[in-house]
Amino acid sequence: MKRFFLVAIASVLFFFNTMVGSANAVELTESTRTIPLDEAGGTTTLTARQFTNGQKIFVDTCTQCHLQGKTKTNNNVSLGLADLAGAEPRRDNVLALVEFLKNPKSYDGEDDYSELHPNISRPDIYPEMRNYTEDDIFDVAGYTLIAPKLDERWGGTIYF
């Protein structure tokens, strides 16, 4: 009887597994993946691979301080689009974020943060950034600009 019961449960689980199918990652539309490239108004569309790579890098490296787009060290400045646009220089486009990840500056652009914020210019201080390529930095910057489109809580704009 016990064996019959186990076979029945296994059959039911197998049936549901084949009928339901596997869960896939969110399919992003082209319009969702299209983001500002530069201050001149140019745009770029990240590929699914670039988005996934940027997301992986963000989760592995950036979420230590920027979980869900918030900033652990300063709750007044997040990675929300409004805060990025309010920075000096603006950081609401891919090339500006790439520049920031190479040579970080304070929110007002006055102070050099190369010893305070992870960047690829100082691999001696931030070894986690040591092996990132230009493409990796581009991808994580792109992910940072796409993320607010995917989660209304990104950057602490709601429920914060």
From Swiss-Prot:
Family annotation (SUPFAM superfamilies): Cytochrome c (SSF46626)
Cofactor note: Binds 1 heme c group covalently per subunit.
Binding site for heme c: C62, C65, H66, H117
Locations listed in the record: Cellular thylakoid membrane
Domain of life of the source: Bacteria
Secretion signal span: 1-25
Subunit: PSII is composed of 1 copy each of membrane proteins PsbA, PsbB, PsbC, PsbD, PsbE, PsbF, PsbH, PsbI, PsbJ, PsbK, PsbL, PsbM, PsbT, PsbX, PsbY, PsbZ, Psb30/Ycf12, peripheral proteins PsbO, CyanoQ (PsbQ), PsbU, PsbV and a large number of cofactors. It forms dimeric complexes. The cyanobacterial oxygen-evolving complex is composed of PsbO, CyanoQ (PsbQ), PsbV and PsbU.
Role this protein plays: One of the extrinsic, lumenal subunits of photosystem II (PSII). PSII is a light-driven water plastoquinone oxidoreductase, using light energy to abstract electrons from H(2)O, generating a proton gradient subsequently used for ATP formation. The extrinsic proteins stabilize the structure of photosystem II oxygen-evolving complex (OEC), the ion environment of oxygen evolution and protect the OEC against heat-induced inactivation. Low-potential cytochrome c that plays a role in the OEC of PSII, required for normal function or stabilization of PSII.
Family to which the UniProt record says this protein belongs: Belongs to the cytochrome c family. PsbV subfamily.
Name under which the protein is recorded: Photosystem II extrinsic protein V
